Design a protein with these regions (language model features):
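Structured nucleic-acid-interacting core domains from mobile-element enzymes and related host factors
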Residues: 1-72
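Intrinsic disorder
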Residues: 15, 19, 89-93, 97, ...
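Active-site-adjacent bridging/hinge elements
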Residues: 22, 71-79, 251-255
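Short helix/loop capping segments that flank catalytic or ligand/cofactor-binding pockets
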Residues: 32-34, 56-57, 126-128, 154-155, ...
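Short, surface-exposed amphipathic charged segments that create phosphate/polyanion-binding patches used
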Residues: 39-40, 154-166
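Glycine-rich phosphate-binding loop of actin/hexokinase-like ATP-binding domains
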Residues: 55-62, 67-69, 138-154
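Active-site beta-loop-alpha junctions of metal-dependent nucleic acid enzymes
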Residues: 60-104
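Acidic/histidine-rich catalytic cores and adjacent linkers
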Residues: 96-143, 147-150, 164-361
Length: 361
């Protein structure tokens, strides 16, 4: 197991000699919910290694079996079949159950422990892991995905802007124009702290920067550090007294406090892009979630195929060799070779220095 060897080389081994891995977790479903209708018949979740970006564990939960359902509709016993129904709870609880199962089987499957987990902010999953206590002497530590932290931060500020009861329209418009500046100020402070070795003091320093960000952006520079505050910005209009008088500043600081509490995750600078990439392959295999593959075992087969495609990059060759014990023909080889060369060129292009957006605020 490559992820295990890399952890041993990095010295991430527990007192009992078992390697401690950092993993990324997330779930996906066979049906789009649009944040309102969580009623998918099937769902899957994956545990992906942080270093290798490969799927270490994947499982599927099904709430429906076509054979059993049709037999029950006519009050008959179903015939002999391989029933795919393995879940009786809600669709939203599938993800937590699968990830809990993966943590409990980590030692038996690979001889490793998942010490740190990177998630998308779903507290239910982490609570399920803690309640199950997969490792008696070790408490799993959670790190939040940086992308989700900033996305939720901006969405909550936009909700304040749209709320007519939050404060005067002039101040809410001022907040709406400066949401991106607030985000950039946090990113800039994080980037400066991560240039050197990150330690416990960096977390407290970053928290102070984040809590001071609204004051800096809205014109109050009393507590600003010269290294992150330009002289030109110090001549801005001070909106803080008006925000404080209207009560809007308190609502802004509630959102900022939530981001400051996750300063450790921001310094770790991790995201769950690797597991999102796996989910995109699953969506490709199931027709963009527009076709119902939840009647029998089709959804499980397609998710398993997505694991092969994600881990190996040569889905057709692996499946053909496993089924027929021979390598596929030249057409399949040339197709996969072109795909591999395309990915190499794309990675080489992405590694070149690019002109990025200015992070000055």
């Amino acid at each position: 197991m490559e992820e295990k060897h890399l952890a041993v080389q990095a010295g991430e081994v527990g007192e009992d000699g078992i390697p401690m891995l950092t993993v990324v977790v997330d779930g996906c479903w066979a049906k789009r919910s649009y944040r309102t209708n969580y009623s998918s018949l099937s769902g899957a979740a994956a545990i992906v290694g942080f270093r290798t970006k490969k799927v270490l564990y994947m499982a599927v939960r099904n709430r429906y079996c076509m054979v059993c359902s049709r037999a029950a509709a006519v009050n008959k016993l179903p015939g002999k079949h391989c029933c795919c129904k393995n879940w009786h709870g809600s669709s939203s609880s599938m993800e937590a159950n699968i990830i809990q199962e993966g943590f409990q089987n980590s030692v038996a499957m690979y001889g490793v422990k998942y010490a740190k987990v990177i998630g998308d902010g779903d507290s239910n999953v982490y609570k399920t892991i803690l309640d199950s206590r997969p490792y008696d002497e070790l408490q799993v530590e959670k790190l939040e995905c940086q992308n989700h932290l900033f996305r939720n931060f901006c969405l909550k500020l936009k909700d304040i802007v749209r709320d007519s009861k939050a404060g005067p329209i002039t101040l809410r418009k001022c907040l709406g124009k400066n949401i991106l500046r607030l985000r950039k100020s946090v990113i800039s402070a994080t980037a400066q702290l991560t240039k050197n070795e990150v330690n416990f003091d960096c977390c407290s320093i970053l928290q102070k920067h984040i809590l001071n960000a609204p004051y800096h952006v809205f014109g109050d520079h009393q507590n600003c550090v010269d290294s992150v505050c330009s002289i030109q910005r110090k001549n801005d209009t001070n909106w803080i007294p008006d925000l404080l008088q209207s009560g809007l500043l308190y609502r802004i600081m509630n959102v900022v406090n939530n981001l400051a509490d996750n300063s450790k995750s921001l310094l770790f600078s991790a995201n769950n892009n690797c597991v999102e990439q796996f989910h995109s392959i699953v969506a490709k295999f199931i027709g963009g979630k527009r076709v119902n593959f939840c009647l029998r075992r089709s959804y499980l087969a397609r998710c398993s195929g997505a694991v092969i495609s994600h881990n190996s990059g040569s889905f057709m060759t692996r499946v053909h060799k496993s089924m027929y014990n021979t390598r596929p023909g030249n057409f399949v080889k040339s197709t996969e070779r072109r795909r591999e060369n395309y990915l190499i060129r794309r990675k080489r292009k992405m590694s070149r220095p690019r002109c990025r957006k200015n992070l000055c605020f």
